[in-house]
Amino acid sequence: MRWHCMDGGNRIVSMYLTTLYYTKEIVDEKTREQEKGKTSFLTDALLNLIYILFFSSSVFNWTRCHLFDTSVIMLHSFHEDGALTNLISHLPTTTVPQYRQLHVPFAILRSCDLKRKSKK
């Protein structure tokens, strides 16, 4: 596997995947709450905090560090249970368009997810 990253690229990748893992846990908890008809301020606050601190930061910037390979790994890792699709639906939609670098991997994920659902 090739990393096309500047200095500190592996650290960024590690932080990226770790953040995704814990975000997935929070999203799973939020999904369980919604199934029970509950809403929790804490899970909403945590998701928004992760988004503000990480996804909207300069660390997650495709122009400085080309992490497309990582995004593909991330898609394969989290695709099966739809965790990232859930994450996307919980992100503050008014903010996402400002960060066009999010669109490429997420668009691929949405496309894969729709194809998977249409086969069932």
Curated annotation (Swiss-Prot):
Domain of life per record: Eukaryota
Subcellular compartments: Membrane
One GO CC term, this protein: membrane
Principal localisation: membrane
Keyword vocabulary terms for this entry: Membrane, Transmembrane, Transmembrane helix
Transmembrane annotation, as ranges: 40-62
Protein name per Swiss-Prot or TrEMBL: Uncharacterized protein YLR302C
Organism: Saccharomyces cerevisiae (strain ATCC 204508 / S288c)
Lineage: Eukaryota, Fungi, Dikarya, Ascomycota, Saccharomycotina
